[in-house]
């Protein structure tokens, strides 16, 4: 009997969907190795492998059969995706073009040899970033440079602006996936894209105000207010937008700073200067990476750099990786909570994830624990451990959807934190 590798869904799925992986037609108790490989848009290969043993019927199902070792061990149905590692050091898996899928190749090899035995079965699966019917609409309105993703069914939908970090450009993959959940999501560029400024010396809130007004006035966006979703620098900018601008009902901040970092934030006649960088506090890890977690002065000392969150009437959710080494995300979330409550504002929800690092992405993206930081100009450690980080991403994705459905007025069941 020939071995078969069975996937469900079989040929394609959305990136954030679970994938069922099973093998049939093996010998009873046969030892095998499963391998996965994905090539990104720049040609880098990401790989994972795990050793398994078939049951007495010659079958194994990753949802019921524990891995015996390899890139991960134990019962990990999606480990062949989240445990992938790049063949290039310090390389982060990023989807640049959401109109094409990532192609994942899976294979079953005989035995547990490190280099792999005879190939017994093989399958190819497409992981898509646009759910069927999701509409992708490039936006060039006034100064706004963005891409709007709309669900397939008729609107209006709850609206969300999505912001990434200091890498600049326009990343669409989180917005495109979220649009498949019933939201109108606009991925917003703010520098180093098209005709936008090439650097971040000053972040003018008027640009972001234009983006907010555009999305709020869109005929397929439900009012009166919209949501913000930001990670890292995008979280910092989301806090500034919620503090200075009108029409923002809800904001999710993923590992964001409460201080202006590396640039000035300005709105009308107000300016927030960047927090002081403490270069003597940059440490080196045993792997030769820079650790910058202590390299920013506390905004409790540099008080002028503290974003005035007390002005905001936005409802906040903070998602925090407790092993974030980019900066002190948990400290920032706690200080924001104290400041809001001291001014009679609603206490924000803070969900902390132990051993999760800086880049909390949609589910199944591999952990990027180290890489180039543009403001530092060197490879730094971002923190995190693969399994707890993967579990954090899974939970955070559900939490932010539940939060936005509740705050922006659409129905969704509550999701309890898993960690």
Curated annotation (Swiss-Prot):
Q: Which GO terms describe its molecular function?
A: carboxylic ester hydrolase activity; fatty acyl-CoA hydrolase activity
Main localization category: cytoplasm
Q: What class of enzyme is it?
A: hydrolase
What happens after mutating residue 232 to C?
Retains 2% of the initial activity; deacylation of the acyl-enzyme intermediate becomes rate-limiting
Catalytic activity reads: hexadecanoyl-CoA + H2O = hexadecanoate + CoA + H(+); decanoyl-CoA + H2O = decanoate + CoA + H(+); dodecanoyl-CoA + H2O = dodecanoate + CoA + H(+); tetradecanoyl-CoA + H2O = tetradecanoate + CoA + H(+)
User: Which tissues show it?
Assistant: Expressed in heart, kidney, brown adipose tissue, white adipose tissue, adrenal gland and muscle.
- Positions carrying Phosphoserine: 416
What's the impact of mutating residue 232 to A? Abolishes activity
The UniProt entry annotates the active site at 232 (charge relay system), 324 (charge relay system), 358 (charge relay system)
Query: Which BP terms from GO are recorded?
Result: acyl-CoA metabolic process; long-chain fatty acid metabolic process
Q: Where in the cell is it found?
A: Cytoplasm, Cytosol
Q: Relate the induction remark in this record.
A: In the liver, by peroxisome proliferator (Clofibrate) treatment, via the peroxisome proliferator-activated receptors (PPARs) or fasting for 24 hours.
Superkingdom: Eukaryota
What is the documented function of this protein? Catalyzes the hydrolysis of acyl-CoAs into free fatty acids and coenzyme A (CoASH), regulating their respective intracellular levels. More active towards saturated and unsaturated long chain fatty acyl-CoAs (C12-C20).
**Which family does the UniProt entry place this protein in?**
Belongs to the C/M/P thioester hydrolase family.
Name assigned to this protein: Acyl-coenzyme A thioesterase 1
The organism named in the record is: Mus musculus
**What lineage is on file?**
Eukaryota, Metazoa, Chordata, Craniata, Vertebrata
Q: Which gene encodes it?
A: Acot1
